[in-house]
Amino acid sequence: MRESGVTLLELLVTLTIVMVLASVALPLSRVSAKRSHEIEFRQHLRNMRAAIDTFKMEWNRDGDVLLGPLCVKNKLSCKDVSSIYGYPKSLEMLLGVKLTSEEATVRGTTIRRYLRNLPLDPLTGKADWQFRCYKDAPNASSWCGDDVYDVMTASQEMALDGTKYRDW
């Protein structure tokens, strides 16, 4: 005669199956979370680098020779916002540059923005980006402070593909 109920053996088998499934799912969720941080990080890098490139195109100069269209039209502020190579002097310059020419009235605004805000580094959780100057070596560990030619993370971690995030 069989009684309805759960035996100890059935409970142990069920518990073992649940533990095996959980041990497989946990590493997959960690990899998935890291991958989503990498995607967000890569997008922030693209946005900031595109903003730097647009700034360079508009405020380009070679020493005292003004080359970029906004640099030519805003001679008074050109040397204040761009380095001798035409790159922004700081990352904050990408948040807004005050236009001094008549173009400000044509555009209807006196501020030219390249970024809406400075994004947080998803790898560190802070806006602690590190920079590289135009004249710095590609593997430079310190920033010269003259301009912002490139941005990188402060994180020393390795990516899922085995490269360092700093090298992205």
Please identify what each model-predicted range represents:
Residues 1, 19, 31, 84, ...:
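Short, flexible active-site loop motifs that bind/organize anionic cofactors or intermediates
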Residues 2-29:
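N-terminal single-pass transmembrane signal-anchor helix
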Residues 17-19, 26, 34, 108-111:
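Preference for short coil/turn "hinge" residues that link or interrupt alpha-helices
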Residues 31, 35-38, 80-84:
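Short, charged/polar micro-motifs that form catalytic or ligand-binding hotspots
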Residues 34-61:
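Membrane-proximal N-terminal amphipathic helix
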Residues 54-168:
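Low-complexity, acidic interaction segments enriched in glycine
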